């Protein structure tokens, strides 16, 4: 899906605001949102690609309005939709809780059970522990050093292929095994592992004469996006 979320190579957004000694969370609810997402991850609820698709499909105006408030607003909206779509909660339950909060009636923040400190440490360790994401899948069609061309496409669903590399020629510089294919995962069709590569593009291939001849941009791209150059 092409939309306002895919801003690679675009200009006119102004300076990136910088806050010295910025806190991890500006509001308490942001930390609680991250806790919800961590819980979903530990429970095996597939949400990375689904959440991206839900955020992308909310419409450009809503996307901008939410992100002006807090980036975590995006994450919370997506988490709610995934929990409903996966039938973990009902839409009626979601609406009821939102209404309670809006009316100031939701005040019970005590956990329903006592937390095990060891479980918390395990969750933190799992988040930071390096590990391979490769899964069993098809043999790769390309090798290191191969010249490839990114397909010209205009997908209606979720994709991890940015607009600025489409129809451009690059070189395979790394292979990462077969990994979860975002197009399938975001649509609830399972992991569907496909070969994943890092492709290097010269800045001039991407930006023409405006590109610096010494610069290279590397992008991770799945095999279905690519054809031989």
Curated annotation (Swiss-Prot):
InterPro entries: CN_hydtase_beta-like_N, CN_hydtase_beta_C, CN_hydtase_beta_dom_C, Elect_transpt_acc-like_dom_sf, Nitrile_hydratase_bsu. Keywords: Lyase. GO terms for molecular function: nitrile hydratase activity; transition metal ion binding. Industrial production of acrylamide is now being developed using some of these enzymes. SUPFAM superfamilies: Electron transport accessory proteins. Induction: By cobalt and urea or cyclohexanecarboxamide. Its EC number is 4.2.1.84. It catalyses: an aliphatic primary amide = an aliphatic nitrile + H2O. It comes from the Bacteria. It is an enzyme of class 4 (lyase). Heterodimer of an alpha and a beta chain. NCBIfam families: nitrile_beta. NHase catalyzes the hydration of various nitrile compounds to the corresponding amides. Belongs to the nitrile hydratase subunit beta family. This is High-molecular weight cobalt-containing nitrile hydratase subunit beta.
